[in-house]
Amino acid sequence: HWKDGIGPKENRKKMINTHWGGVVEDNSFGTHEFFELCRQLGCKTYVNGNVGSGTVQEMSEWVEYMTFEGVSPMADLRKKNGHEKAWKVDYFGVGNENWGCGGNMTPEYYGNLYRRYQTYVRHYQDSAPIQKICGGPNAGDDNWTKKVLETCFASPAPEDAHGFMDGLSMHYYTVPGESWMNKGFATEFTTDGWYQALGKALHMDDLIKKHGAILDQYDPEKKIGLIVDEWGNWHEVEPGTNPGFLYQQNTMRDALVAAVTLNIFNKHCDRVKMACIAQLINVLQSVILTEGEKMILTPTYHIFHMYKYHQDAELLRSDLTGVDTIQNGEFSIPALQESVSVQKDGTITVTLANLSAEQSYPVEIALTEKKNRTVSAKILTGAMNAHNTFEEPDAVKEESFEGVAEKDGTLSLEIPACSVICLRIS
């Protein structure tokens, strides 16, 4: 409840975090601290409201507290707590995982609650309307998607309300092991475990197509974004750590999962409007691990760093031909996978992943326009379980790749096994 996390820290309520670790939650990181972090990072804000155990009034008052500039009880309380100016809320999630830990609701029940709660997520700033995110499915639960959309689009509703939502969330985790009860460890796995993780990660493409097809029935103009706001590898925790803290190491296997998933998101950017890996620091597929004052960057961090050029760029159509298929149990895995975009200045970014744990492949990249070009490349590669530690923080890091040749508008290279290459063509 958000009011437990405002005001002087010494006066904030303490509670037991029954979901994660059974430790005392002192609410020292609340609304003000969250917005200060976003200010320092220079990132947009995505706030999630409590539908499972909170009231409509509580949610409405929180939005007022955060975004109303004038005189009102909640705006006055914000000012009393030290922040005169209202914040900007870019995205507001109305509930979280209400099919499970957020209330074990049926989709019809949640859909009606969503319609009610979102009504009171007011737009107090005309120049910065809040984008409302409806709680969508867990992985492949298309019944949830169908029933929630059916409920939200039912009459009475304004014709231009598009279901009272700007986005529909979806959660999907890659569990490399046999089941949730036997997920397998981050650093100890076989080649089968490598391909099992990649095969499950590639399933993201099927999920986006499945839920996207349902969205198309209600929203053919694609005004509603699919918000994949929890994704990534979920391993067993590192031995000796609190099971509720979800602390896990991060290897080249995680890097490849991130790479192929981001390539999938790129290719579905007409529907996927946001995607948030879970989570940034010390939890699940992190980009940063810390130990006291020390911090290290994970292989997944380097993938994000290499892929950053795709952001705010325009997708270019790309196809791979003559690619081997790796058969591993139930999984048929393409040996190579890619996505391509172009920035406003004309620079093309190609991100290419080799999903094979053992074999390198020659690649030719045919460019449709024959021009004089400058090509630079970075590579992230290593043994399939290679990872960074506090003793060896740079065991896995992106490096320059000099193995690109150009002739008559065609680029050629050999991509090593277990690697990701980012090409920049300008």
What residue ranges belong to the model's regions?
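Aromatic-lined substrate-binding rim segments of carbohydrate-active enzymes
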Residues: 1-68, 110-129
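Acidic, Ser/Thr/Pro-rich beta/coil linker or hinge segments at domain junctions
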Residues: 371-411
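Aromatic/acidic polysaccharide-binding cleft in carbohydrate-active enzymes
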Residues: 172, 223-338
